[in-house]
């Protein structure tokens, strides 16, 4: 496995946080360019899950399922109770999971669209993982 693959999600997360920082200062994330950064960020996580070691794939998959529940609850709170400031905690949490990181982009007008994109990314990453069963085939020299 290539060592640089581990740097992809972290670099993508840093880019997403950096791109969103001005938006938070000015008054919330801007949908257009934020969407582009976040989609690239989710693709990096999907590549990592697809090419990482089996052990890391299991660990990250478990984190994703837990994070999806937390993110869903948070998005519900943000949209229902108009808690835009609550999103400020998500850049740091995005280092743990892209499903939490996607909340960088969620605002009152786009939650369903971003949620749909997140589900597509998760479906791709988990559905296209290599088999977790050990390879029993012998290589012929």
Pin down the residues of each PLM region:
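Short, charged juxtamembrane terminal tails flanking transmembrane helices
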Residues: 1, 130-141
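Hydrophobic alpha-helical transmembrane segments
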Residues: 99-123
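Hydrophobic alpha-helical membrane-insertion segments
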Residues: 61-83
């Amino acid at each position: 496995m290539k060592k640089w693959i581990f740097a992809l999600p972290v670099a993508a997360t840093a880019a997403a946080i950096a791109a969103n920082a001005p938006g938070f200062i000015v008054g919330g994330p801007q949908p257009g360019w934020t969407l582009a950064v976040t989609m690239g960020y989710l693709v990096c996580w999907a590549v990592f899950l697809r090419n990482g070691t089996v052990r890391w794939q299991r660990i990250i998959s478990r984190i994703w399922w837990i994070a999806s529940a937390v993110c869903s609850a948070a998005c519900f709170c943000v949209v229902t109770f108009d808690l835009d400031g609550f999103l400020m905690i998500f850049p740091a949490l995005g280092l743990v999971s892209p499903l939490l990181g996607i909340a960088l982009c969620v605002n009152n007008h786009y939650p369903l669209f971003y949620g749909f994109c997140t589900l597509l990314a998760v479906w791709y990453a988990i559905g296209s993982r290599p088999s977790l069963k050990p390879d029993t085939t012998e290589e012929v020299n």
